[in-house]
Amino acid sequence: MRELAPGLWHWTAPHPAWESSEPWDQNVSSYATDDGKRLLLFDPLGVPCEIEERAADRDAAIVLTAPWHERDAQNLVERLGVPVYTPLPDTAEYLMQTYGITAEQAGDGSPDVVWLLKEGIGEARVYAAGDRLDAGVEAFPGQKPNDMVLWIESRRAVVAGDTLAELGRGLDINPRWLGPGVTREQVAEGLRPLLDLPVEHVLATHGGPHEPAVLKRVLS
């Protein structure tokens, strides 16, 4: 674990579902912020004990950049009782339109965070692009309707899930993960308002921390 700035931490852990055919590194990144009152865990996996201990006397919460980045969220909710901010998972209709599968194959939609949204485990706080979370986080649209890029004003940090990722060629918007009919330029356009913000940290969950100049290169 490394403290990037006062109240801002980064660590990595091996993703349990990783396969050698994946374009991303097995070790993925998670982040935490602590302003003395509120502790936020972003896409948490393998949370260090030092961070977990802070949850006892903080208003703690988990923030997912995408529902499929739930990682250790359920385990943390069951042990710490923290709420989870998350975008909604893919609907059955979206899966059929996007991947050309049948209604039977699509079922009830993506099973991401089903434990949270349908099984009553934990408190879900659903958000979407354009929302300002009461946790002090603003959500910007990513490469899919439920894959967000987050602005944390108190730490002057941008946290990205799959939209801005390091896949061997530097941090970038990866064409491989774009939805049907979505172009790289469209994604970049939706994120350019970030260039007007005082960004000091660009925090990728696939690729780790980067300098703010990288964001300008990617979005210009």
Walk through the language-model features, giving the residues of each.
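Structured helix-beta-strand junction loops
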Residues: 36, 58, 79, 197-198
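Residue-level marker for well-ordered alpha-helical positions
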Residues: 27, 70-71, 188
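Residues that flank catalytic or metal-binding motifs in active/ligand-binding sites
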Residues: 29, 80, 146
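Metallo-beta-lactamase
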Residues: 2, 6-9, 13-16, 38-41, ...
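Active-site HxH/HxHxD metal-binding segment of metal-dependent hydrolases
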Residues: 46-129
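Residues that act as N-cap/strand-start positions at coil-to-secondary-structure junctions
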Residues: 25-27, 121, 127, 144
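Pre-active-site segment of Zn-dependent metallo-hydrolases
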Residues: 16-61
